[in-house]
Amino acid sequence: MNEIIFSVTSAPEGGFMAQALCHSIYTEADDWIGLRAAVREAVLCHFDEGKGPAMIRLHRVEEEVLAVS
């Protein structure tokens, strides 16, 4: 496996939530630096040694609603 992709969203109570797209890996943290560390740790725990991805891609998704009138 070469890469694993996480979808990252803002948590309603603050901080961030991350979910892997093709694996059952979920984690959260209070800030971006903490999230990066939490995602890396979750990936290392999820896969057997030598079986995990070489890279982790964090795809941050933000939604904003704008009023037209």
What label would you give each PLM region?
Residues S10, C22, R60-E63:
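Non-catalytic surface loops within mature trypsin-like serine protease
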Residues F16-A18, E28, A37, L66:
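Short acidic, gly/pro-rich beta-turn/loop elements at beta-sheet edges
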Residues S7-A20:
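Short aromatic-glycine-(Arg/Gly/Cys) micro-motifs in beta-strand/loop hairpins
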Residues N2, L21-H23:
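Short strand-coil-strand connectors
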Residues H23-I33:
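A short, exposed loop/beta-hairpin motif centered on an aromatic-Gly-Thr core
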Residues M1-I5, I33, A37-S69:
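Short, charged, surface-exposed hinge/linker loops at domain edges
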